[in-house]
From Swiss-Prot:
Name of the protein this chain belongs to: Small ribosomal subunit protein uS3
Homology family: Belongs to the universal ribosomal protein uS3 family.
Annotated function: Binds the lower part of the 30S subunit head. Binds mRNA in the 70S ribosome, positioning it for translation.
GO molecular function, one term: structural constituent of ribosome
The keyword Ribonucleoprotein appears for this protein: yes
Subunit comment: Part of the 30S ribosomal subunit. Forms a tight complex with proteins S10 and S14.
Domain of life (superkingdom): Bacteria
Bilayer-spanning residue ranges: none
InterPro entries associated with the record: KH_dom, KH_dom-like_a/b, KH_dom_type_2, KH_sf_prok-type, Ribosomal_S3_C_sf, Ribosomal_uS3_bac-typ, Ribosomal_uS3_C, Ribosomal_uS3_CS
Name of the encoding gene: rpsC
Domain KH type-2: 38-106
Organism of this sequence: Bacillus subtilis (strain 168)
Alphabetized PROSITE patterns for the sequence: KH_TYPE_2, RIBOSOMAL_S3
Gene Ontology CC entries for this record: cytosolic small ribosomal subunit
Protein backbone atom coordinates (compact mmCIF):
# COMPACT_ATOMS: atom_id res chain seq x y z
CA UNK A 1 0.00 0.00 0.00
CA UNK A 2 2.83 2.38 0.88
CA UNK A 3 4.17 1.99 -2.66
CA UNK A 4 0.93 3.19 -4.26
CA UNK A 5 -0.57 5.87 -2.02
CA UNK A 6 0.50 9.53 -2.01
CA UNK A 7 3.20 9.67 0.74
CA UNK A 8 2.06 13.13 1.91
CA UNK A 9 -1.62 12.17 2.21
CA UNK A 10 -0.72 8.97 4.06
CA UNK A 11 1.16 10.97 6.72
CA UNK A 12 -1.41 13.75 7.27
CA UNK A 13 -2.45 13.73 10.91
CA UNK A 14 0.66 11.70 11.82
CA UNK A 15 3.67 13.88 10.97
CA UNK A 16 2.20 16.22 8.33
CA UNK A 17 -0.45 18.92 8.65
CA UNK A 18 -3.23 20.02 6.32
CA UNK A 19 -2.49 22.82 3.82
CA UNK A 20 -6.06 24.16 4.13
CA UNK A 21 -6.97 24.84 7.76
CA UNK A 22 -10.64 25.72 8.12
CA UNK A 23 -14.00 24.19 8.95
CA UNK A 24 -17.19 24.72 6.95
CA UNK A 25 -20.68 23.27 6.96
CA UNK A 26 -22.83 24.14 3.96
CA UNK A 27 -20.12 26.43 2.55
CA UNK A 28 -17.60 23.60 2.18
CA UNK A 29 -17.86 23.34 -1.63
CA UNK A 30 -17.60 27.13 -2.09
CA UNK A 31 -14.53 27.35 0.16
CA UNK A 32 -12.89 24.41 -1.60
CA UNK A 33 -13.35 26.00 -5.05
CA UNK A 34 -12.09 29.30 -3.65
CA UNK A 35 -8.96 27.56 -2.33
CA UNK A 36 -8.34 26.01 -5.75
CA UNK A 37 -8.74 29.42 -7.44
CA UNK A 38 -6.33 31.04 -4.97
CA UNK A 39 -3.69 28.33 -5.45
CA UNK A 40 -4.05 28.39 -9.25
CA UNK A 41 -3.76 32.19 -9.36
CA UNK A 42 -0.67 32.25 -7.11
CA UNK A 43 0.92 29.41 -9.10
CA UNK A 44 0.51 31.31 -12.39
CA UNK A 45 1.46 34.75 -11.06
CA UNK A 46 4.52 33.52 -9.13
CA UNK A 47 5.62 30.82 -11.59
CA UNK A 48 9.25 32.07 -11.52
CA UNK A 49 9.41 32.64 -7.75
CA UNK A 50 10.07 29.00 -6.71
CA UNK A 51 6.84 28.63 -4.71
CA UNK A 52 6.68 25.25 -2.95
CA UNK A 53 3.29 25.34 -1.23
CA UNK A 54 0.45 27.65 -0.24
CA UNK A 55 -1.28 27.28 3.15
CA UNK A 56 -4.75 28.77 3.62
CA UNK A 57 -6.48 29.56 6.93
CA UNK A 58 -9.92 31.12 7.34
CA UNK A 59 -11.54 33.09 10.16
CA UNK A 60 -14.91 34.82 9.63
CA UNK A 61 -14.51 37.06 6.55
CA UNK A 62 -10.71 36.90 6.58
CA UNK A 63 -8.33 34.64 4.64
CA UNK A 64 -4.75 34.14 5.85
CA UNK A 65 -2.41 32.86 3.13
CA UNK A 66 1.12 31.62 3.82
CA UNK A 67 3.39 31.30 0.78
CA UNK A 68 6.48 29.08 1.11
CA UNK A 69 9.08 30.24 -1.42
CA UNK A 70 12.82 29.96 -2.07
CA UNK A 71 12.86 33.51 -3.54
CA UNK A 72 11.03 35.75 -1.03
CA UNK A 73 12.52 38.92 -2.55
CA UNK A 74 10.79 38.20 -5.86
CA UNK A 75 7.43 37.66 -4.12
CA UNK A 76 7.69 40.75 -1.89
CA UNK A 77 9.08 43.10 -4.55
CA UNK A 78 10.73 46.50 -4.07
CA UNK A 79 9.35 48.03 -0.88
CA UNK A 80 6.64 45.36 -0.72
CA UNK A 81 5.03 46.47 -4.00
CA UNK A 82 4.61 42.97 -5.45
CA UNK A 83 3.05 41.40 -2.37
CA UNK A 84 0.67 44.36 -1.99
CA UNK A 85 -0.44 44.01 -5.63
CA UNK A 86 -0.94 40.27 -5.06
CA UNK A 87 -3.00 40.95 -1.92
CA UNK A 88 -5.28 43.38 -3.79
CA UNK A 89 -5.74 40.88 -6.63
CA UNK A 90 -6.68 38.12 -4.16
CA UNK A 91 -9.04 40.52 -2.34
CA UNK A 92 -10.99 41.07 -5.55
CA UNK A 93 -10.81 37.36 -6.47
CA UNK A 94 -12.29 36.18 -3.17
CA UNK A 95 -14.29 39.21 -2.04
CA UNK A 96 -12.73 38.78 1.42
CA UNK A 97 -9.96 40.45 3.42
CA UNK A 98 -6.72 38.67 2.53
CA UNK A 99 -3.57 38.67 4.66
CA UNK A 100 -0.35 37.26 3.14
CA UNK A 101 2.66 35.80 4.99
CA UNK A 102 5.90 34.92 3.21
CA UNK A 103 8.09 32.09 4.54
CA UNK A 104 11.54 31.47 3.07
CA UNK A 105 12.67 27.94 2.19
CA UNK A 106 16.29 27.79 3.31
CA UNK A 107 17.29 24.58 1.50
CA UNK A 108 15.52 24.35 -1.86
CA UNK A 109 17.26 21.06 -2.76
CA UNK A 110 15.39 19.31 0.09
CA UNK A 111 11.96 20.47 -1.11
CA UNK A 112 10.31 17.93 -3.43
CA UNK A 113 8.14 20.48 -5.26
CA UNK A 114 11.08 22.76 -6.08
CA UNK A 115 13.21 19.77 -7.13
CA UNK A 116 10.43 18.45 -9.42
CA UNK A 117 9.91 21.90 -10.96
CA UNK A 118 13.66 22.25 -11.53
CA UNK A 119 13.86 18.90 -13.36
CA UNK A 120 10.80 19.86 -15.46
CA UNK A 121 12.37 23.22 -16.46
CA UNK A 122 15.58 21.42 -17.49
CA UNK A 123 13.59 18.98 -19.63
CA UNK A 124 11.87 21.94 -21.33
CA UNK A 125 15.34 23.36 -22.07
CA UNK A 126 16.24 20.10 -23.88
CA UNK A 127 18.56 18.76 -21.18
CA UNK A 128 18.81 14.94 -21.25
CA UNK A 129 16.33 13.36 -18.82
CA UNK A 130 19.06 11.08 -17.44
CA UNK A 131 21.44 13.98 -16.83
CA UNK A 132 18.73 16.18 -15.28
CA UNK A 133 17.72 13.45 -12.81
CA UNK A 134 21.24 12.34 -11.86
CA UNK A 135 22.53 15.88 -11.28
CA UNK A 136 19.52 16.79 -9.14
CA UNK A 137 19.84 13.59 -7.08
CA UNK A 138 23.50 14.44 -6.35
CA UNK A 139 22.57 17.98 -5.27
CA UNK A 140 19.75 16.72 -3.02
CA UNK A 141 21.98 14.11 -1.34
CA UNK A 142 24.69 16.74 -0.78
CA UNK A 143 22.05 18.98 0.85
CA UNK A 144 21.53 16.34 3.55
CA UNK A 145 18.79 13.99 2.30
CA UNK A 146 18.95 10.36 3.45
CA UNK A 147 17.36 9.13 0.23
CA UNK A 148 15.84 10.42 -3.00
CA UNK A 149 13.97 8.89 -5.93
CA UNK A 150 12.99 10.65 -9.16
CA UNK A 151 10.87 9.43 -12.07
CA UNK A 152 10.24 10.92 -15.50
CA UNK A 153 7.44 9.53 -17.71
CA UNK A 154 6.40 10.21 -21.29
CA UNK A 155 7.99 10.24 -24.73
CA UNK A 156 11.54 10.29 -23.42
CA UNK A 157 14.03 11.55 -25.98
CA UNK A 158 11.21 11.85 -28.52
CA UNK A 159 10.59 8.08 -28.62
CA UNK A 160 7.38 6.86 -30.29
CA UNK A 161 6.37 4.77 -27.28
CA UNK A 162 6.04 6.47 -23.88
CA UNK A 163 7.88 4.93 -20.95
CA UNK A 164 9.04 5.72 -17.43
CA UNK A 165 12.59 5.86 -16.11
CA UNK A 166 13.53 6.39 -12.49
CA UNK A 167 16.75 6.86 -10.58
CA UNK A 168 17.29 6.61 -6.84
CA UNK A 169 19.98 6.92 -4.21
CA UNK A 170 19.89 6.12 -0.50
CA UNK A 171 16.71 4.75 1.11
CA UNK A 172 13.09 5.91 0.75
CA UNK A 173 10.98 3.92 3.30
CA UNK A 174 7.47 4.60 1.98
CA UNK A 175 5.79 2.32 4.52
CA UNK A 176 7.31 3.91 7.64
CA UNK A 177 4.83 6.54 8.85
CA UNK A 178 7.39 8.33 11.02
CA UNK A 179 9.65 8.76 7.97
CA UNK A 180 9.61 12.39 6.79
CA UNK A 181 9.09 11.84 3.05
CA UNK A 182 8.35 14.82 0.83
CA UNK A 183 6.63 13.98 -2.45
CA UNK A 184 5.69 16.21 -5.40
CA UNK A 185 4.87 16.11 -9.10
CA UNK A 186 5.47 18.50 -11.97
CA UNK A 187 4.99 18.61 -15.74
CA UNK A 188 7.31 19.60 -18.58
CA UNK A 189 5.88 20.79 -21.91
CA UNK A 190 8.23 19.60 -24.65
CA UNK A 191 7.96 19.55 -28.45
CA UNK A 192 6.99 15.85 -28.23
CA UNK A 193 4.26 16.41 -25.64
CA UNK A 194 4.07 16.44 -21.87
CA UNK A 195 6.54 14.68 -19.59
CA UNK A 196 5.55 13.89 -16.01
CA UNK A 197 8.05 14.28 -13.17
CA UNK A 198 7.73 12.68 -9.71
CA UNK A 199 10.10 13.20 -6.79
CA UNK A 200 10.37 11.47 -3.39
CA UNK A 201 12.82 12.87 -0.80
CA UNK A 202 13.51 11.10 2.53
CA UNK A 203 14.67 13.67 5.07
CA UNK A 204 15.01 11.41 8.11
CA UNK A 205 12.69 10.17 10.86
CA UNK A 206 10.56 12.42 13.04
CA UNK A 207 8.32 11.84 16.11
CA UNK A 208 10.90 11.11 18.83
CA UNK A 209 8.78 9.95 21.80
CA UNK A 210 8.59 12.17 24.88
CA UNK A 211 9.38 9.24 27.20
CA UNK A 212 12.72 8.58 25.52
CA UNK A 213 13.63 12.26 25.72
CA UNK A 214 12.71 12.40 29.41
CA UNK A 215 14.70 9.24 30.16
CA UNK A 216 17.66 10.63 28.25
CA UNK A 217 17.42 13.87 30.24
CA UNK A 218 17.50 11.96 33.54
Amino acid sequence: MGQKVNPVGLRIGVIRDWESKWYAGKDYADFLHEDLKIREYISKRLSDASVSKVEIERAANRVNITIHTAKPGMVIGKGGSEVEALRKALNSLTGKRVHINILEIKRADLDAQLVADNIARQLENRVSFRRAQKQQIQRTMRAGAQGVKTMVSGRLGGADIARSEYYSEGTVPLHTLRADIDYATSEADTTYGKLGVKVWIYRGEVLPTKKKNEEGGK
